[in-house]
Every structure is written in structure tokens, then in C-alpha cells.
Regions:
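Bacterial N-terminal signal peptides
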Residues: 4-15
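C-terminal catalytic region of ATP-dependent kinase domains
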Residues: 27, 99-114, 388-523
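Conserved kinase catalytic-core segment
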Residues: 220-223, 228, 337-419
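Conserved ATP-binding subdomain of kinase catalytic cores across diverse folds
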Residues: 175-335
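Second-shell loop/turn segments in exported
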Residues: 38, 211-219, 252-255, 349-356, ...
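Extracytoplasmic/periplasmic, Sec-exported soluble proteins
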Residues: 41, 66, 198, 218-222, ...
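Regulatory N- and C-terminal appendages and interdomain linkers associated
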Residues: 17-191, 208-210, 473-523
């Protein structure tokens, strides 16, 4: 089922185009049935945009909280741009405004086409071509510096990435600059809200003391590992941890709201309007399958299947049985403690605006390839407002990094969290056509993202070497720290460590950096 999803999602990514930001053009803000056209460099257009956004915000809340938050940010940015800032500040406000508008638009963008017609078959076949590292043009956002080796130049400061102060000294067990792991296992949490996104993996939110925590029953170990690596190398990623089980006070809504995820539907047609077949790719899950134990008030324990058998009569709950249950313990989950100062607006896309011309977004392709992270659909990213309301800033997050550490190449055969399927290498030496000329200096051969990813395709040898120098600073014990915190057993930790080191060493050699970074060994 997931293969159908990513194949269809690729059709939406097909038309993404890379290029520099041209702000002197008409953009469209789409909210429900409303479309607002504006040119961000024209004050008259900004005033009109501001008025229309105020009208949208004055209506009863019919839009999602993310869209409404985006409209509030558009209002703030527009008014600041009209308040006579310096030319440099005005340009940044215009860029932030357009980024926010596109993120709001992306909220209404379906993860797959709402219908697939036979006439789209050639386009679908083109989706099978998902290149990485075939770029020729240098990144457009490099800091000033020598031109003899562009791979040594960092990108200009941005909302996507910041230079890590000292990669080799980071504690990747706790990760994310924290003094320790969250102590969720020690708390009795209370059910708070269902998961209502389009994600395939079930989950829900709980309140654990003063913290709101997201539980996700899928990619329980790969996501904590991959997020730690992205964060360590300077990207914005949600602090994600492995939990062997979470104690949640009994609440009927755990079961009645478990399948609240949004449907993901597509209709197959011929001649564009004759329906042939409809499919909902969002499958319902049995909530009792994610209960490891139910703990009764008298101290007895029931398994998930036993709880279901005793608690339910058909689709009806038995109140007398409910009264006996103190709390449930979930199966392993990946958990994210929500930061009240980090709020989502909507997804950003690897191919929108100048994203594919940015060194840091291109370089993320090599990091993704090393870790086998393949799920690069646009809805696995988020543009977020960070900080207090009086001084907010925008940051681009890699928000769902779970698809990795498994089978990393194929037409429709990716599979994460599979140590035996995870290859030992993913690069090859430069291809020499003779006479001292290198036809293909960058060859990534063991990795393919699941959708066309323009920024990864645009990656050049210089972008790859830039990222490889960051990866090369990681120590083997840091890899072990991250794997241990991610809940893997000792044998799996050992094999993953060997493979990640092997992939790292081969990558360093194939990119011509062996003189800078000696081979890493398993300490």
C-alpha cells in the first residue's frame, strides 16, 4: 500500500522546478475557495494582501490551525514590509512572505493526486527516474571566498541550516543539545488528542505532566537515529526518542479516535472523467494491537488481545470493565515532546523557490543517502514559526525522518528499519572516460529517494564534498550513542555501526577526501 502512495506522490513532485528566487512576479495565496494574487515587491499589492488576509482571519475558524497560523504570519510579514525597513530587511521579509504563502498553499495540497487517468501513464513512467547528484551548476547561496575549491565554502546563513559549533563533541545519546532524555517512562500520561494528519503510521498525543507528547507507532527506532544525525550536522529536526512503552491513563478515546488520520484517496479514471476504481490508501489499524498491557486497579495485567476480548461486545464498550482499568502500556513508540515555542505553518517543497539551488538542501541529499533516508515527499517537511510571539523567526524543518536504515534502492521496494537489507556501500568511484577527464565525479549508486527530489538531483560534486566533510567529523562512538538511544538491541547496534562506518569510509574515498579524513574504525 505504501508503494502505491509514494508512486502516486511522485506525480505531484514531477513538475517541481529549481531556480533562483524571482520575487518580482505574481504569487498566489490559496485558502479554501479564495485566491489572492500579489507581487511582494509592490507596496500596493502588499496592502491589498494585508486587507484580504485580515478578512480571512475575521471569519469563524474554518481553516486548520496551521493555515490560520500561516495567515497570522503573512499579516505580520506584510505589515513589517510596509513599515519602511532597510532594503536588506525588506528583501528578507519578501522571501519569508513567499515561503509562508507557499507553505499555507501546501496545506491544501494532497499527498497523492486525487485522481489518476490512463493518459497520465507516460508521466507515471517518468517518475521512475529519480536521479541524485547529477547537478552541474554551483549552488547559488555560497558565502564569499576562494573560487578554486567551491566545496570548502559554507552556505550563507539561512532558515534551513546553521554551522554546528563542534560536531565531534556532541552527545548523540541525548541529542538536540539536551542535558538528558525526557523521562516519559516514569510518568503516567493522559490522552490528549488523536492524530489527524495523512501519515500512514497511527499515533496520538498525550499530556505527561506539563508536557504535550506525540506518540507514533511506526519507525520507532529509525526516526530517532536519523533525526539525531540531521540535527548534529546543522539541520532543524524535531527531537525524537524511542520509548519501549508509554503509560497512559485509561480513556475510551484511545480506541474510538485511533483511526482519525485523514483519508488518502485517489480515483482511477479513463478519458479524464469516467471513474473506474477508487482507493483509500489510509488503512484502519486495530488500536488493541498497540497495547502491550492493560493494568487493572487491583494490580492484574491483561494483554492487548485479552483487553479487547473482555472490554468489547461487538462495537460496544462495557462500562463495568472500563471501571476496572487503571492505565494501558503502549507498545514501543517514537515520541516527540512538543515545544510550545515551535509552531507549524505547513510543508515546504524541495523543488519550490530556490530550495534546489541551496547548498545545504542539496547537501542533505548526501546525508540522506548515507542514512538510507528515502521518504522525501513534500509532506514530510514543515515551515515553522519559532520563538516568542514578539520576536518570531521562520525555520525550515525536516519533520518526518523515519524512512531509513533499510532497503534504499528500487522501483517500489524501499523498506526502513531493516539492518540486513541496509547496504554496506552507496557510492562508487568517479567514472573515468580517459584522457584525464572525469565524466561522472559523483556517483551515488545504492540509493534512490521515493519521489523526484529536485534539490538532491541538483547536488554537485562540490555540494557532496561539503556535506561529506561534515559527516566525516562524526566519531564511531557517537554513532553507537545514537543507535543505543534509538532502542536497538546490541547485535543490531553492532551491525548498523559496521555498515554506517563502511558507508562513510567508502563515501570519503570515492569523493577524494581520504587525505583529509582517515578511515573510521569500530572502537
Amino acid at each position: 500500500m505504501r508503494e502505491c502512495l509514494v508512486f502516486a506522490a511522485g506525480l505531484l513532485a514531477f513538475n517541481a522546478v529549481a531556480g533562483p528566487v524571482n520575487l518580482n512576479q505574481v504569487f498566489k495565496l490559496r485558502v479554501g475557495a479564495e485566491t489572492v494574487r500579489f507581487n511582494p515587491v509592490e507596496d500596493g499589492d502588499l496592502r491589498r494582501l494585508d486587507r484580504q488576509v485580515q478578512v480571512l482571519l475575521s471569519k469563524p475558524e474554518g481553516e486548520s490551525k496551521h493555515t490560520r497560523r500561516g495567515l497570522e504570519e503573512i499579516e505580520r510579514l506584510t505589515e513589517n514590509a510596509l513599515n519602511r525597513p532597510t532594503p536588506a530587511d525588506r528583501k528578507q521579509l519578501e522571501i519569508d512572505l513567499v515561503e509562508t504563502v507557499l507553505a499555507v498553499n501546501n496545506n491544501a495540497r494532497p499527498p497523492i493526486p486525487r485522481h489518476f487517468d490512463a493518459i497520465m501513464t507516460p508521466l507515471a513512467l517518468l517518475q521512475l527516474f529519480r536521479p541524485i547528484g547529477i547537478g552541474q551548476k554551483p549552488a547559488a547561496n555560497l558565502q564569499p571566498g576562494p573560487t578554486d575549491d567551491l566545496s570548502r565554502r559554507d552556505p550563507l546563513p539561512s532558515s534551513f541550516w546553521s554551522l554546528p559549533p563542534d560536531i565531534a563533541t556532541e552527545n548523540l545519546h541525548d541529542g538536540f543539545g539536551r542535558p538528558g532524555l525526557p523521562r516519559i517512562a516514569d510518568k503516567l500520561c493522559r490522552y490528549a488528542a488523536p492524530k489527524e494528519t495523512t501519515g500512514m503510521n497511527p499515533g496520538f498525543e498525550v499530556d505527561c505532566g506539563q508536557e504535550r507528547v506525540k506518540l507514533k507507532f511506526g519507525e520507532v527506532s529509525s526516526e530517532p537515529l536519523v533525526t539525531r544525525m540531521f540535527w548534529a550536522l546543522g539541520f532543524h529536526a524535531d527531537p525524537t526518542d524511542y520509548a519501549a512503552g508509554v503509560k497512559v491513563a485509561y480513556d475510551r478515546r484511545i480506541f474510538t479516535e485511533f483511526n482519525s488520520r485523514q483519508p488518502v484517496r485517489t480515483t482511477f479514471t479513463v478519458l479524464w472523467f469516467i471513474p473506474v476504481y477508487s482507493m483509500n490508501l489510509q488503512r484502519s489499524k486495530d488500536p488493541f494491537a498497540y497495547v502491550a498491557a492493560a493494568v487493572l486497579r487491583d494490580g492484574r495485567h491483561w494483554s492487548g488481545p485479552e483487553l479487547k476480548r473482555r472490554l468489547m461486545t461487538g462495537t460496544n464498550f462495557l462500562p463495568a470493565v472500563e471501571a476496572q482499568i487503571d492505565y494501558v502500556v503502549t507498545t514501543p513508540a517514537n515520541v516527540q515532546v512538543k515545544d510550545p515555542l515551535v509552531k507549524s505553518i505547513g510543508p515546504w517543497d524541495y523543488g519550490q523557490l530556490d530550495h534546489a539551488n541551496r547548498r545545504e538542501v542539496r547537501g542533505a541529499g548526501l546525508l540522506a543517502a548515507w542514512l538510507g533516508f528515502y521518504d522525501t515527499r513534500f509532506d514530510n517537511t514543515k515551515l515553522r514559526v519559532v520563538g516568542p510571539k514578539k520576536h518570531p523567526r521562520l525555520e525550515h524543518y525536516f519533520s518526518d525522518l523515519g524512512g531509513g536504515l533499510g532497503r534504499t534502492k528500487g522501483l517500489l521496494s524501499w523498506h526502513g528499519e531493516n539492518v540486513n537489507a541496509f547496504p554496506w556501500t552507496f557510492t562508487a568511484p568517479p567514472l573515468d572516460l580517459g584522457k584525464g577527464r572525469l565524466a561522472r565525479p559523483l556517483r551515488i549508486v545504492g540509493y534512490t529517494p521515493d519521489v523526484r527530489t529536485p534539490a538532491f538531483a541538483a547536488m554537485t560534486i562540490d555540494d557532496a564534498r561539503w556535506m561529506a566533510r561534515l559527516i566525516g567529523q562524526l566519531r564511531s562512538d557517537q554513532i553507537i550513542q545514537a543507535l543505543t538511544a534509538s532502542g536497538y538491541d546490541p547485535a543490531t547496534i553492532h551491525l548498523y555501526t559496521q555498515k554506517l562506518i563502511s558507508r562513510r569510509n567508502k563515501m570519503i574515498a570515492d569523493l577524494g577526501l581520504a587525505g583529509e579524513f582517515p578511515p573510521l574504525t569500530l572502537e
